[in-house]
Amino acid sequence: MAQHFSLAACDVVGFDLDHTLCRYNLPESAPLIYNSFARFLVKEKGYDKELLTVTPEDWDFCCKGLALDLEDGTFIKLAENGTVLRASHGTKMMTPDMLAEAYGKKEWKYFVSDTGMPSHPGKYYFYDNYFDLPGALLCARVADSLTKQNSGQKTFDFWKDIVAGIQHNFKMSAFKAYRFTTAWNSSSSCAIHIEKKNCGLYFPEIKRDPGKYLHSCPESVRNWLQQLKSAGKILLLITSSHSDYCKLLCEYTLGDDFADLFDIVITNALKPGFFSHSPSQRPFYTLKDDEEQESLPSLDKPGWYSQGNSAHLYELLKKMTSKPKPKVVYFGDSMHSDIFPASHYSHWETVLILEELRGEEGEKPEEAEPLEKKGKYEFLNGKIQRTPWFIHGLLTKSVLTALLQFQVLKQLQHPTMTIAEM
């Protein structure tokens, strides 16, 4: 991997969507995500109604780089060498003595020192982006509730209910208001079945009032994307969001003609598997009316696709650029889903979009209050304030500032640094 990054040297520029090109209004979207899951757990799975009440102080628990041990409900923060820096059982922080007794100076049980990455992904969940963080708070409060109800319960099995909540709120069919199917009976008459979709709380709310939860993209970013295309760059949009939700986000943030900005759009990419899985494991699918159709043995032309893999994509990029080794850079906000897999498996250059670099509106870095004094979500009169975490300037010329270059190179050299230091 090159130690010096030049955007001008790249043939292909790819982007994630959520929290990268699409900036969310986090003080509104975070409670929406939390409530989407909490209501499902209370209504469908019988969890304590106290989960529905969140105080401003509760949000201070949210912190990037937490790993949840799915068996015992413990959240840990790892050092680069795999030792545990701090931990909490649910939301209850362990004292230094408790931490020493539970973990000592040994590597965490799921950490593999030769790769520098945790193993056994079915045993833990890693929270490294703002879409997931409300779920971390919910899981911690679930662990608190179960511990209280069951007199110090040590092991848990609530993760299956969290997964069910994810499926309910974010499955591919959840975005659609209705699904129409037809069936012919023996008398050759047709019956039309109308199945109500629009599941959960999240998608209906976003569709009802997108301006409450999303920020439009600055014109400077649109201009920059157009300049990249004019300079002969191939532009990619690779998102794990489904096709219909991707359209809603892009139309609101980039405009109705957003598709003209990109040569290839890939939705439901199922990252990080898009980068790590083989073509046979993750083929591309065509789309019709936002629903997946036939699988493709290869990717032969630009367009809009679903799922897929970076290997077949790269073969297409070779044809489009007429180069045996086109250079690709990918912008994303998640170390787990974007930065590490794109760099490690696909050998792409990567740029981490780190919202925290901005600080407060109008403040110089040296004047800003230290981050350790602040939670990730600021409140006033019981309501999360509109703190400007994302800097779209990172997607313009300042993407090549010394600060971001330093951050990117450090991440490429030490892919677990986010766990310990973010």
Model-predicted segments: where are they?
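HAD-like aspartate-dependent phosphatase fold
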Residues: 1-422
